[in-house]
Amino acid sequence: MSTSSPFRVASKIVTAGCLCLPLFQRVLSDLSCEENEMCVNYDERYPDGWYIWFFLLIFLVVLLCGVVLFCLQCWLKRCGINPPRRTMAVFAVGDLDPVYGAEMAGSPTSGICHPTQNTELCSAPCFGALGPPPPYEEILKAN
């Protein structure tokens, strides 16, 4: 009969606690006190094992930061923030209108395009020598 994952994790936590308990008892115990000697109260002297509590505190802070970062990563992955943006160039050509180009940057999921400035697009004089485009019927005959 197999146990589920939460019970395995709980048993590992209990095992780790049982292994760490003697370490903490040793830090908190007064080892310098013998049977015939007068013992010094633990609260009246500086503990020798302060660094263990310091490392335990650092470990807990790192563990907390790791859990927060893991949850943040899962949340960002689920929300799908920052979808890849695509650029689309639109050129409008008409008999009476000058030739101009506009570049739109839009998101594929939102369908909203935002005009952007692009200096690489040719200006109207660049296309002025070509003349108007051929009629639709001539294009069909050429194919």
Curated annotation (Swiss-Prot):
InterPro entries: TMEM207. GO terms for cellular component: membrane. This is Transmembrane protein 207. Keywords: Membrane, Signal, Transmembrane, Transmembrane helix. It is a single-pass type I membrane protein. Residues 1-29 form the signal peptide. The chain crosses the membrane at residues 52-72. It is found in: Membrane. Interacts with WWOX. The lineage of its organism: Eukaryota, Metazoa, Chordata, Craniata, Vertebrata.
